[in-house]
Amino acid sequence: MLVLTLATISTLAVSPQNAQAQKEAFEVVSVKLIVPGSGPGRPGMFMNAGPGCSLTGVQVDPRRVAVAAPLFTLIATAHGGNCRVPDMIIGGTDWMKTDRWDIEAVMPEGSPTYTPAQFVGGNAPKINAMLQTLLADRFKVAVHRETREVTVNVLTVGKGSPKLAAANDADQPARRINARKDQEGKPFLEFIAGKATMATLAEMLQLATSRPVVDRTGISGNFNIRFEYDNDGIARPTVFTALQEELGLRLESAKEKMEVLVIDRAEKPSDN
């Protein structure tokens, strides 16, 4: 089962970066509104992190790109945002999270080859640039970035010494949060960060807490991290308790000024 994985935006009309991104475009594009209850849809890789934040039927093979998603998720994917951290994307209307769109597109000859996992994880820059162009053309999407004060979680060392297992050179990086069930069928989540820095841990904790996380541990090095948690604290401790008990780290709420993505405009396209 695919679970949560990791994923520069300025005003589209003026930014040099976005001007460059506008030059990147798919050769062929099909955009269709998905009718609710119309069936299971296209098979493929998926990511589901709650209402308005999902990608399904993801295929990249090798020039053809296909995905089904709400516009909110498509904007976040195209512009390097994170739909799993709501405070970091401002604006938009309800239909952008509820209506789902099926998109099929063909990249130009000579485009880089990506895997579905790279696209879902935000590591397919050429596809993202072409998706920016598609969204601007078909959905009339315009966005910009600005600095706002938002609620964050600050990662610090708890009471006593941190309990972290240092990674070896031979260890492999790993970044995943797996959905599991215990012997009684109660669901919980398995957090795995292999050969990870504290900055990487902070990035992954954004997915677990749906808030920006700022690393203030002062700890350097790579570590193998694994713990189990439950958002409701029933089958397992909450992520906050698990961090303290298993790793000797704390998450504390605070206000910080951070750069956020602001959605200025979007329209529903016509089917083609």
Residue ranges and their predicted role:
Residues M1-N272:
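Beta-strand-rich assembly/attachment modules of structural machines
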